[in-house]
Structure formats: C-alpha cells, structure tokens
Regions:
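Structural signal for well-ordered, non-membrane alpha-helices
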Residues: 16-27, 57-62, 102-116, 142, ...
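Acidic/histidine-rich alpha-helical segments that form the ligand environment
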Residues: 15, 81-119
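Alpha-helical initiation/capping and key positions within long helical/coiled-coil segments
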Residues: 7, 11, 48, 52, ...
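Extreme N-terminal tail/first-helix region
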Residues: 1-18
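Short, contiguous alpha-helical
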Residues: 32-83, 117-162
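Short amphipathic alpha-helical segments at helix-loop
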Residues: 1-4, 38-41, 86-93, 126
Length: 162
C-alpha cells in the first residue's frame, strides 16, 4: 500500500491526541501503576510505557530524516532495545517523560512534513506504516496505560501480555 503525507500526519495526530488526553490527567499514583507484563520482562509502570512509546516514535522520526541509529542502539534485538529505553527513563520523572512525549510529537510532525514525497509513495508499505506513530502507540495506550489506570478490581482480571 502506498501512503500520502496527509494521511500519515492525520493518523499520527489522531493517536497523539488520544494518548495525550489520557496521560495529561494522570495522578502521581497512576503514573506509578504497573502495566500488565510477563514476569520475565522489566516491570514497567505507566510512565515507562509512555517512555517506550515515545522512544519508538522518536526512532521513526530519526529514520524518516535519514539519520543513523545511535551507536549504542545498533545491533540490539527488540527486547534489548526495549530494556535500554527502560533503563534510560525509569528514574526520570513523569513530568520529564510527558515533556519528551510532547517534544517528540513536534519532531515527528516536522520530519513528516520535511520528508521527500518518495518516503510516502516510493514503495508499497504495510497499511499501518509507520506503525510506531499510531498502531504501536494505540496498542500500548489501550493495553498498558488505560488498563493500568482502570479501577484496581478490573485491572487484576486483565491478563499479562508481551
């Protein structure tokens, strides 16, 4: 499937607004709530999930700009990359992560607007491309963040994933 700049930007803005609406009103206790994860994975909180979403959005902007991957991220598999993000951000405040989330959205939109047309229409891509800007974000928003901030009784009935 070929995409248009306008369609990708529209999807990106739509998901950002949904996510920002949720995280903008979190209490300090909600930021610290654990999200459903297998015991073998790092113990993410709501804050860690937002940092994860934001990192991969920033990585998409980097890729769209044609910038190289940072040396410390080269050659990492998905689990190793996710762990690196967790270790970088786990001691940072929710305020820092929220500010980064908002700055990265500006960076993403700038990258999308500045990208050559061939980025969007040069080759066929998956329907949800670029996935980290909407589908991946929506998945973590719904399955991690929104689930974790539900009432505790409903949260306990949720099954762990990943």
């Amino acid at each position: 499937m070929r995409h248009t700049r306008e369609e990708v930007i529209k999807r990106t803005i739509s998901e950002y607004r949904k996510l920002d609406r949720v995280v903008s009103k979190l209490t300090p206790a909600q930021w610290r709530r654990r999200v459903p994860r297998p015991e073998t994975k790092d113990p993410w909180t709501v804050k860690d999930s937002l940092a994860h979403i934001t990192h991969w959005k920033a990585d998409t902007a980097r890729s769209i700009r044609g910038d190289p991957r940072p040396p410390e991220e080269r050659g990492l598999n998905m689990t190793e990359g996710n762990r690196l993000v967790y270790l970088r951000w786990r001691k940072r405040s929710p305020r820092d992560v929220l500010a980064w989330h908002r700055q990265v959205q500006k960076d993403v939109l700038a990258a999308l607007r500045a990208a050559p047309n061939k980025v969007f229409s040069g080759r066929s891509r998956d329907p949800d491309w670029p996935g980290d800007l909407d589908g991946h974000s929506a998945s973590h928003r719904i399955q991690d963040i929104e689930r974790a901030v539900q009432s505790p009784g409903r949260q306990k009935r949720s099954s762990a994933r990943r």
